[in-house]
Amino acid sequence: MDSQAQQLATRLTTAFNGGGAASSRPWLWRPLLQLLAQGRPVTVEQIAQATDRTPDQVREALAANPDTEYDERGRITGSGLTQNPTPHHFEVDGQQLYTWCALDTLIFPAILGRPAHVTSPCHATGTPVRLTVEPDQVTSVEPATAVVSIVTPDAPASIRTAFCNQVHFFATPDAGKGWLEEHPVATVLPVADAYQLGRPLTEALLTGDTPPGCC
C-alpha cells in the first residue's frame, strides 16, 4: 500500500479510536461479529461467554459505541455487521445480512474467516455493484469500474453518522463526481485499493494498535 493510502488508514484508525469504535475494545469485536453472522439477535450473556468477560464488562464496552443496534428485548442486532436491512447486502454461509457501509463489506470476510457475496446499489445511479470477497482478497467485482467513497471524520461521537453513512459504492468514478463535489474532502478508490486500505485498519481494530506509520 502506498504512503498516501497508509496515511489515510492511519487517519481513519485515529478517528475511530476517538469515536468509541472497536479499536478501544478489540476483545469484543470479532466475537460479536461472529455471533451476529449467525443471523439471530445476540444476548449480552452470549458475548460474555464468548469473550470470557462478565456481563457488566460487556455492557460497558457496548455502551462505548452509541451506534450499537438493539431489538425490543435488548439483544444486539447490529454493530457494523447488522441483521437490519441497509443498502449493503452481505451474504455469508447462506445467511442474508447487511453492513453499515461499503468498506465493511470488504473487511468483514477477513474478520469472520468466511467468503461473502455482496450486492449494493451505486449511490448515484442505483446500478447494482456485486462483489465476491474472500478473507484474503476480492475475487470478483461487477462492474469492474466500481469505486468506494472514503471520508476521514475527526473523532466523531457517532462513527456511523460521520463515516459509515458517507462510504458508498459507485459504479464508476464518473458516477461519483457529483457526490465528490458535495463532499470535497472525500475521495473515491477502486474496490481493490479500498480493500487494501481496509487491511491495516482491520488489524488495528482487532489489536487496538494504530497502523505502522502513525505518529
Swiss-Prot record:
This is Alkylmercury lyase. HAMAP family: MerB. The lineage of its organism: Bacteria, Bacillati, Actinomycetota, Actinomycetes, Kitasatosporales. Pfam families: HTH_15 (PF12324), MerB (PF03243). The keyword Lyase applies. Transmembrane segments: none annotated. Gene3D superfamilies: 3.30.450.410. Cleaves the carbon-mercury bond of organomercurials such as phenylmercuric acetate. One product is Hg(2+), which is subsequently detoxified by the mercuric reductase. InterPro entries: MerB, MerB_HTH_dom, MerB_lyase_sf, WH_DNA-bd_sf. One of its GO terms (molecular function) is alkylmercury lyase activity. Belongs to the MerB family. It catalyses: an alkylmercury + H(+) = an alkane + Hg(2+). Its EC number is 4.99.1.2. NCBIfam families: lyase_MerB, PRK13239.1. The gene is merB. GO terms for biological process: response to mercury ion. Keywords: Lyase, Mercuric resistance, Mercury. The keyword Lyase applies.
